[in-house]
Amino acid sequence: DSIYILDEPENSLSAENQLKLKRFIEDSTRFYNCQFIISTHSPFLLKLMDAKIYDLDDTPVVTKKWTELSNVLVYYNFFKQYEEEFDKK
């Protein structure tokens, strides 16, 4: 029954390690009943199970789904633009 505050924990972590951190946080909330308050730009961490996301770029601050956040849409549009290159593999 603890609360942890993390400020951009994805800094210096590879995408693979961000996914490991995501799993660790989800397991911690499930098995140890703790809560996390996280400031992040990582689409991996924004996809945390049952996360309540506050978009601090909006005035007033609103809650959004992770797929509605502008930085996630930038990633999506970037990879969508090069989708054919992934299909060639």
Where are these regions (language model features)?
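Walker B motif beta-strand of ABC-family P-loop ATPases
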Residues: 3-5
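ABC ATPase nucleotide-binding domain "signature" loop
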Residues: 11-14
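C-terminal lobe/lid and adjacent interdomain/linker elements of RecA-like ASCE P-loop ATPase modules
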Residues: 16-37, 42-89
